[in-house]
Amino acid sequence: MPESADPRDRLIVALDLPDVEAAERLVARIGDAATFYKIGYRLAYAGGLDFAARLAKSGKKTFLDLKLHDIGNTVEEGVRSASALGATFLTVHAYPQTMRAAVRGRGPGLKILAVTVLTSYDDADAAEAGYALPIADLVARRAEQAAEIGIDGIVCSAVEAGAVRHRIGPSGLIVTPGIRPAGAEAGDQKRVMTPGQARAAGIDHVVVGRPITGADDPRAVAQRIVAEMEDA
């Protein structure tokens, strides 16, 4: 399991906010309590990619959660563009052709993460979407394919982390959304753990959004999460 020199890197704050101004305010309030930020669709479509580049230039790490999935050439060129923004992580959907294209486009310093199954899904959702396998088996199969292709890490729920680690080995990254501090509401996440449980399960990075972004004191919440993982 890869270790970061800075324990704060294990926490990725999800900037699921409506505009860049709100994101800038939150980053300023958190200060040095966090070093790693995720930009997803909502912020990306509101100027968030330029903001991500500025964050990277300021010394922060950025995770572009864009979940690319398209024809190979489009994915490959999209990954090259993300590399130019100074991103640390970029997500693609864990389909073999998509993952191979992403590996071809990967530049220095960028790590590609494959999204296995969204953490808002349970087995009933997967069945409704037409998948024949239960989620645990689907995640394991996609993780194994990702490792064979050369993907840097896997995005999965904490519940599947052990099975994923078995398939990607000790050097692969496991990044987990759906993390909620003790006492926080699960929201639309269906497969959740606390930060301490996630760290004990061998997860490298946890993604936390609303418990931080909606807090009266987001800096303090970020500090507590980092401390909880340190103590696990």
From Swiss-Prot:
Pathway per the UniProt entry: Pyrimidine metabolism; UMP biosynthesis via de novo pathway; UMP from orotate: step 2/2
Q: Mind listing the GO molecular function terms for this protein? A: orotidine-5'-phosphate decarboxylase activity
PROSITE patterns xrefs:
OMPDECASE
Q: Biological process GO terms, please? A: 'de novo' pyrimidine nucleobase biosynthetic process; 'de novo' UMP biosynthetic process
Cellular component terms per the entry's GO annotation: cytosol
Q: Which first-to-last residue range defines the signal peptide? A: none
| Keyword tags | Decarboxylase, Lyase, Pyrimidine biosynthesis
Lyase is among the record's keywords: yes
Query: Has UniProt tagged this entry with the keyword Lyase?
Result: yes
SUPFAM superfamilies, sorted = Ribulose-phoshate binding barrel
Which class of enzymes does this protein belong to?
A: lyase
Its EC number is 4.1.1.23
State whether it acts alone or in a complex, and with which partners, per the record. Answer: Homodimer.
UniProt xrefs under PANTHER family:
OROTIDINE 5'-PHOSPHATE DECARBOXYLASE
| Cited NCBIfam families | PRK00230.1, pyrF
Stated role? Catalyzes the decarboxylation of orotidine 5'-monophosphate (OMP) to uridine 5'-monophosphate (UMP).
Q: What is this protein called?
A: Orotidine 5'-phosphate decarboxylase
Q: Which organism is it from?
A: Methylorubrum extorquens (strain PA1) (Methylobacterium extorquens)
The gene coding this protein: pyrF
